């Protein structure tokens, strides 16, 4: 065989290999702007490790909705408030499913199954989501306020102790990770972690769930988009290690609950109610999925928002917000009973606005969990075929200058007026549409209660050392840019009790009210 023939054959092989590895799951969508990429990788290299800000910049050139190639997957990005509202809310019946990804769905989730939020839409997902939504709706949430009473009190009690009555600056992260996680564990299993913020089980769950969150991220695993990379064992080894560690504590928590049910010592909880209901229509795999969802969701939204909300309140600009919030709380509760009344009602509009602005400004899930359309969707005349993956750029939408006035400023006041800022859908901090966060009512009450109690108990101020102060930027504050959710970089805050005697009195009252939960 001549060298020329060998050369032609080699070129042909390379050509067909490139064509094979360069193909996409969905052909190019006609009529929809496309960001130019490179063979095989598509736009992965250009997107880098900050997909939200890169896509936000592209939107200025290619329009609010465009298509990209991420390896062999074609993805449609929506980057403005109105484009998300059109696709995620007005077209929500079509945009109801989720795509599957190799690392999270085939490796990490091979033993426990998928969370509700990461499951493709089918009858099983419908049953699981209905069960979770019923357990987390507004009336049900009110019945959980004793749990929030206990967990918020526990965090504030330890902040008071560990800050030596406000004389030492302190990192609030672990306190409010436990606040959110214990709330979820008590709701789902009737179990709480009773140790301090350094408890071994608490740290293990937080560490593993943060790791698993990275595998759920749309930007962290190139092997999800380039199948050839899956042949390298290191790509799967870390995911498998996290799966084993997660299996251990999920099995432990469920076994403890089942043992308590058998002994008649269990406390009312979501999974316990299902296990004891002879008419429950959920099988073992579906029950595991609900458990998985409650554990992971407890750390997804509330801790990052609350921790960074505290960071802003403690900043120099945050002093004005603290003062107004405290003044507004005192107007409604001049007798100093806000600590207890915030469990029963939500009657301080400024604090409600503060919660909304926290969720918008920090947008702790910058690129929401992806969606997949179950039928064709039309956008500006372009037909986006069934089975296409969609990414909501929640960060870009929540910072959309055509919708929000001065979006880069932290201004709770924007939600006190009937302007475009304050009316309709307030933000995309919980996603949107048919698969938005089912626990949003619970999360709102957690944030509202924590804010009322923190602001009435303490004045929060900048750390004494400049190097301990937080980064007050929603993207730059993230220690892991490719993670699904914001992992705040370490920082410290000063917590000075307004009236130590009164704060201890409130703590003692909460301890008495919630002693049955311990």
Swiss-Prot record:
SUPFAM superfamilies: Cytochrome P450 (SSF48264). Induction: Induced by phenylacetate. Pathway: Aromatic compound metabolism; phenylacetate degradation. It is an enzyme of class 1 (oxidoreductase). Keywords: Heme, Iron, Metal-binding, Monooxygenase, NAD, Oxidoreductase. Disruption phenotype: Increases penicillin production, probably by relieving the competition for the precursor phenylacetate by the catabolic homogentisate pathway and the penicillin biosynthetic pathway. It catalyses: 2-phenylacetate + reduced [NADPH--hemoprotein reductase] + O2 = (2-hydroxyphenyl)acetate + oxidized [NADPH--hemoprotein reductase] + H2O + H(+). Coiled coil: none annotated. It comes from the Eukaryota. One of its GO terms (biological process) is penicillin biosynthetic process. Heme binds at residue 437. One of its GO terms (molecular function) is heme binding. Its EC number is 1.14.14.54. Belongs to the cytochrome P450 family. Catalyzes the hydroxylation of phenylacetate to 2-hydroxyphenylacetate in the homogentisate pathway. The homogentisate pathway is used to catabolize phenylacetate and use it as a carbon source. Can also catalyze the hydroxylation of 3-hydroxyphenylacetate to 2,5-dihydroxyphenylacetate (homogentisate) at low efficiency. PANTHER family: P450, PUTATIVE (EUROFUNG)-RELATED-RELATED (PTHR46300), P450, PUTATIVE-RELATED (PTHR46300:SF9). This is Phenylacetate 2-hydroxylase. It comes from Emericella nidulans.
